[in-house]
Every structure is written in C-alpha cells, then in structure tokens.
Design a protein with these regions (language model features):
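Catalytic-core segments of nucleotide cyclases and related cyclic-nucleotide turnover enzymes
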Residues: 61-64, 80-117
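Histidine (H) residue identity feature
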Residues: 6, 16, 70, 84-85, ...
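Conserved long alpha-helical elements within nucleotide-processing catalytic cores of c-di-GMP signaling
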Residues: 5-31, 41-45, 49-50, 61, ...
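GGDEF/GGEEF active-site signature
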Residues: 25-88
Length: 117
C-alpha cells in the first residue's frame, strides 16, 4: 500500500488540477516495474495499492526494493507498507496489516527523512 506524503498540501497550494496530475503520474510510476498480471489500484484519496495476482514473497521484496531505490523518480514523496495475503486470512486483515505498516513507515520517514538520491 502506498500513501502520498503531503498530498493535501499539493492540492491546497497548487490546485486540484495539479493534484490530479500528480495522481496520474504517481500511478504511472507505480506501474513502471510491473508485469502484465500485476495491477495498480487507487484505494481512494492519495492511497494506492499494487496487487500481485500470484502470491510470491520474493517478487514482493523485489518490487519493494525497486520502489525505494527509484523513489526520487516519483512525482511526489510517498510512504510504503508492503505485505502479502496469507491463505485463510480475510482480505480485510491483509489490508489492515498493510495499512499499519504504511503508517509506521510514514511516521518513521517523518522523524528521519530519506536521504536525497
């Protein structure tokens, strides 16, 4: 799960048209490393999710590293909470875990910003 950092500030200072452009550009950034069976979903507001159809924790780790290594190419800073769906687990539980990881990462980045690339 991804959350754009300070997105409200973009809308408030640069206007909603610019905010809409940032959302489209960010979705394109998220799609960059994905294969044909992998999708980007906008969850609402400034939250996005990358959905991997085939559960592969190795692929999840590769994508997480790609996004962190290419963060400077994103149109805006973001926070990332990665997790995978466990068989037998509800989708709601998976989303809640991703959301918890996302907000822990967001708090960490605000305390200790990532170095510029």
């Amino acid at each position: 799960m991804f959350d754009l950092d300070h997105f409200k500030q973009i809308n408030d200072t640069q206007g909603h048209a610019r905010g809409d452009t940032v959302l489209v550009e960010f979705a394109a950034f998220l799609r960059s490393p994905l294969g044909a069976a992998e999708n980007v979903v906008r969850m609402g507001g400034d939250e996005f999710m990358v959905v991997l159809i085939t559960p592969d924790t190795g692929r999840l780790a590769v994508l997480e590293q790609w996004y962190l290594q290419h963060a400077a190419q994103s149109p805006t800073p973001f926070s990332l909470g990665a997790t995978h769906h466990t068989p037998g687990e509800s989708v709601g539980d998976t989303l809640q875990r991703a959301d918890s990881r996302l907000y822990r990462e967001r708090a960490r980045v605000r305390r200790h910003p990532r170095p510029a690339s």
